[in-house]
Amino acid sequence: MTFEIPDFMPVIPELFVLGMACAILVIDLFVPQSRRDITYGLSQFTLIGAAILTIALASPETRFTFNDTFIADGLSDLLKVAVYLITAVVFLYSRPYLQDRDIYKGEYYVLGLFGVLGMMIMISSYSFLTLYLGLELLSLSLYAMVAFNRDSARASEAAMKYFILGAIASGMLLYGMSILYGITGSLDIKEVSDYLITSGAGLNVPLVFALSFVIVGLAFKLGAVPFHMWVPDVYHGAPTSVTLFIGTAPKLAGLAIIMRLLVDGLGPLHHDWQGMLTILAVLSLAVGNVVAIAQTNIKRMLAYSTISHVGFILMGILAGTHEGYAAALFYTLVYAIVAAGGFGMIILLSRRGFEAENLDDFRGLNERSPWFAFIMLLIMFSMAGVPPTVGFYAKLAVLQAVVQVEMIWLAIFAVIFSIVGAFYYLRAVKIMYFDKPEDESPLPKALDMNVVLSINGLLVIVLGIFPGLLMSLATGAISW
């Protein structure tokens, strides 16, 4: 048996992030608390450098390395660059929050970078083994980040819930993968797909168990109903800077794992997992939108909102067409942008000794800051799917994909619950514009955050006016 040296070119961004994360961890040991901005600056440099490397190494051809366990293609390039940019925005929004609570530590950024590395591996994995390693690297980083504020009992409780349910989900996913390995004799996603095509065995009992465990494991990780119980507690209990991270970039990696595992690996069983995803999508749309109405805590409201958005993403996947996959990718990218702005606004209104977690904390925001009230209005309208924001076109693309495969009932169901969901978004707008402020203090004047948050909000309307800019990228990245 001859040993071949693998091609390291496709994994250079991963190696760069790994090396920099380890270096930052060591450098942070010697950086005094007053100079903690050095760690922050190096973390941002790492993300920018990784983005440049990924773009520079991008190729129209699909490349494999490490015995076909690692893939670099259009989907991986787009999602990785999106992860870098979203994480850079998350780090920028988080800095004043961490400083005000005396938890401005280098470990936050190091854990974030290791989480990014896990997402990169997930996005480019083409084997059950690499996919699971990337997933666990991300999960372990997130568990630690949720418990980052050690003085908060609520954060520790949320981290424990997240860890226990995350471990159960990982076990189910791993068990499903092990059954697939027993059936096909391979951990390689392409070989699993080839086996299912050539054997023509159909859905036998072992495959039913394998598919069920894989779907349940993925549903847990995505937070789809009925496996969503960790989402509101973790979003509420974690520091807002961590909720911001959990609610944005990992959704991009979650889409990648579905595309690699279900579409690439288990594509021949599409008609079987389509029904499972339909149930998850319907329940997520219904429960997410209805329960969100009863929330007075905006972090819990956005958590249930996330669950309903997962339902839309699953609708694009279950369509099983090129248009459906592109719509799901477009929707996920849009959601990450909008969610970053939403949680960024919560951080903007928070200050030392005060968490702007309740809807009432947004009362009269228009009187305190008309500009940021307008930014929050754009974000809420986009989440509700109001034209001409980009959220409207994201929902429209998914609905078109579902209608094309003659699942008109599902499209009607989604529209009905989108209208239901519009209530709690518009309630937030009403509170900002028509209620009197309880707090008259001016908003913080952190220039970098104010500028980026403004750009973040304006992107919602710019991409809504020119949706083709992002949609063309999403369509080009999908090769199925």
Curated annotation (Swiss-Prot):
Domain of life: Bacteria
Gene Ontology biological process: ATP synthesis coupled electron transport
EC class (word): translocase
Keywords: Cell inner membrane, Cell membrane, Membrane, NAD, Quinone, Translocase, Transmembrane, Transmembrane helix, Transport, Ubiquinone
Membrane topology: Multi-pass membrane protein
Keyword Nuclease: no
Record's keyword annotation contains Ribosomal protein: no
GO molecular function, one term: quinone binding
Signal peptide (UniProt feature, chain positions): none
The reaction(s) this protein catalyses: a quinone + NADH + 5 H(+)(in) = a quinol + NAD(+) + 4 H(+)(out)
Cellular component per GO, a single term: plasma membrane
EC number: 7.1.1.-
Locations listed in the record: Cell inner membrane
Parts of the chain that traverse the membrane: 11-31, 38-58, 74-94, 109-129, 163-183, 200-220, 239-259, 273-293, 301-321, 329-349, 372-392, 405-425, 451-471
Coiled-coil intervals: none
Function: NDH-1 shuttles electrons from NADH, via FMN and iron-sulfur (Fe-S) centers, to quinones in the respiratory chain. The immediate electron acceptor for the enzyme in this species is believed to be ubiquinone. Couples the redox reaction to proton translocation (for every two electrons transferred, four hydrogen ions are translocated across the cytoplasmic membrane), and thus conserves the redox energy in a proton gradient.
Assembly description: NDH-1 is composed of 14 different subunits. Subunits NuoA, H, J, K, L, M, N constitute the membrane sector of the complex.
Family, similarity comment: Belongs to the complex I subunit 2 family.
The name this protein goes by in its record: NADH-quinone oxidoreductase subunit N
Source species: Thioalkalivibrio sulfidiphilus (strain HL-EbGR7)
Gene this protein is translated from: nuoN
